[in-house]
Regions:
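Mid/C-terminal beta-alpha module of Rossmann-like enzyme folds, strongest
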Residues: 180-240, 256, 276-277
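NAD(P)-dependent short-chain dehydrogenase/reductase
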Residues: 118-170
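Active-site Tyr-X1-5-Lys
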Residues: 92-124, 131
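Amphipathic terminal alpha-helices
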Residues: 258-261, 269-282
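Short-chain dehydrogenase/reductase
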Residues: 39-42, 81-82, 92-104, 137, ...
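Conserved Rossmann-fold NAD(P)-dependent oxidoreductase catalytic core, especially the SDR/UDP-sugar
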Residues: 46, 50-96
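NAD(P)H-binding glycine-rich loop region in Rossmannoid oxidoreductase-like domains
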Residues: 5-46, 54, 73-74
Length: 282
């Protein structure tokens, strides 16, 4: 396996990087930052399509790409345990979810137009935690992002207990190492192409996460949290980083049986480790 770095907007560079590749794993995606919508789209959408086309030109057998649980959207009729057959209906305001869902649709169209390959593998991870996970380190926008790591790592060691609002909503977490194992199985396993849900076993709540971090949860009823999140999500001129509040409006809990059966994948990290290593430290 070889890691290659480059600009996904540069088609020539992508073709050079994909030359003679048997499988291409593409993870580049802009999640936070101050870039314009046009710049973000040029990386997230056009850049990923460029990568797929370069892989096809190189004769790669497989193209593995990371989508997200957010592609399902956060809707009141979401069942607990959505399978990969559940429709992709992204959140109304969250650009990240909208672009992941659009990307799935466009990649499927590209793959259908090329019956000889590459075969398309789409992973839909839940909330990813770990020392290198972007979402765990960039909860605050722009120059404030480094504060997240410091606050999380020090809060549990303060002499005065810190209370944190903890909505009583079900959550799924997955450790970055388990996502890495799923990506590897997409590369080497015999499982068929398509979408795969990736999440740790079991369902927890925000209060569980808060306690594992050494903080004191201040319970918030699920109904109140959902109402507040829905109200905030509809506010005009909501900045991109604040759009994530829509994820708290309704749960999105996935079934991972297909990945376990078809890919031979299983999460190895317990919930306690997933919670305790969001920004480094084990």
């Amino acid at each position: 396996m070889e890691y290659r770095r480059g600009d996904v907007r540069d088609t020539k560079a992508l073709q050079d990087a994909s030359g003679h590749a048997d499988v291409v794993v593409h993870l580049a995606f802009m999640v936070t930052g101050a870039a314009s919508g046009e710049a973000i789209r040029s990386i997230n959408i056009e850049g990923t399509l460029n990568a797929f086309r370069a892989a096809a030109t190189a004769g790669a057998r497989r193209f593995v790409c990371s989508s997200s649980v957010a592609a399902y959207g956060f809707h009141p009729d979401n069942p607990i345990g959505m399978t990969e057959d559940w429709p992709v209906r992204p959140a109304a305001r969250l650009f990240y979810a909208q672009e992941k869902a659009e990307l799935e649709r466009l990649l499927r169209a590209e793959a259908a137009a090329r019956p000889t390959g590459p075969a398309l593998y789409l992973l839909r991870p839940s909330i990813v935690l770990g020392p290198h996970a972007m979402g765990a380190k960039a909860l605050l926008p722009g120059a404030l992002a480094p504060l997240t790591r410091s606050l999380v790592m020090r809060a549990g060691r303060l002499p005065v207990p810190v209370r944190v609002l903890a909505p009583a909503l079900p959550l799924q977490l997955v450790h970055e190492e388990d996502v890495g194992r799923a990506l590897l199985q997409c590369v080497i396993a015999a499982g068929p192409p398509g979408a795969y849900n990736i999440a740790g076993d079991g369902i927890i709540t925000a209060a569980d996460v808060v306690r594992e971090l050494g903080l004191l949860p201040l319970p918030v009823p699920a109904g109140a949290a959902q109402f507040a999140a829905s109200a905030i999500a509809t506010a005009p001129l909501l900045p991109p980083v604040a759009q994530w509040v829509e994820a708290a409006s309704h749960p999105a809990i996935m079934d991972t049986a297909r990945a376990k059966k078809e890919l031979g994948w299983a999460p190895a990290s317990p919930h306690s480790r997933r919670c305790r290593t969001p920004c480094g430290g084990d």
